[in-house]
Amino acid sequence: MNFEQVKLEYDFYDLEPYIDTLTMETHYGKHHASYTKNFNEAVEKAGLSNKSVEEILSTLSLVSDQALRDSLQNNGGGYYNHNLYFSVMSPKKGTKPSLALEEAINRDFGSMENLVEILQNLALGQFGSGWAFLSSDKEGKLYATKSANQNNPFMEDGHNTPILAIDVWEHAYYLQYKNLRGDYVKNFFKVLDWEKVSKNYEHCK
C-alpha cells in the first residue's frame, strides 16, 4: 500500500484571509508531502505495507527497532494528522454539525460554544509543537485532547478515532500570524467544515 496525501477539495487560496496561500502552499506542498514520503519509506522498511495507517499507529509497540518505530510514529503521525487537518477545512460558510454530532457535543460538552472554547484552550495550552483533537470512541462518546509533536489518540489509547485536528506546529501559522497562535486558532474555526467533521463522526460508530 502506498499512502498518499489527502486530495484537497479546495484551492490553496480558498481559505483566505484566515489561512493564506503561502502558508497552504508550504504546509501542504512541502511539510505534509515530506511526512508522506518519509512514512512510506518507513512502512516499506518495516514490512507493514499491508497495514492501514490506523493499524500501524495503534500498534507501534510491536515494532522492535527503536529508530524505525520513532520514524513510523513521527512521520506516520504527521501523515495521518495532516490528512485529517486538511480534510476538515473548507471555504464554505456557516456549516453545521449533523444532528447526531450536535447531540453528542451537547451531551459531552454542554454546548458547541463550550466545545470550541475547550479546543481553543487545548490548542493554546499545548507547549511547543503539537495538536488539539476532537475524537470519538466506538460508542460515539466524544473526547477533547491535545498531543505533543505528531502524536495522536491512536498512539495514546488505541481506541479513540480523531474526527477533527488543529495543527499548532509553527509551520501551520507562523508565515501569516507570526507568534500570534491565538489569532490563528480562533480563525481556524472560521474555515472548519462541521459537515466534514460530522461524516468523520459517523464513520467511527
Please give the residue ranges for each predicted region.
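Feature for soluble, non-membrane regions of globular proteins
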Residues: 1-205
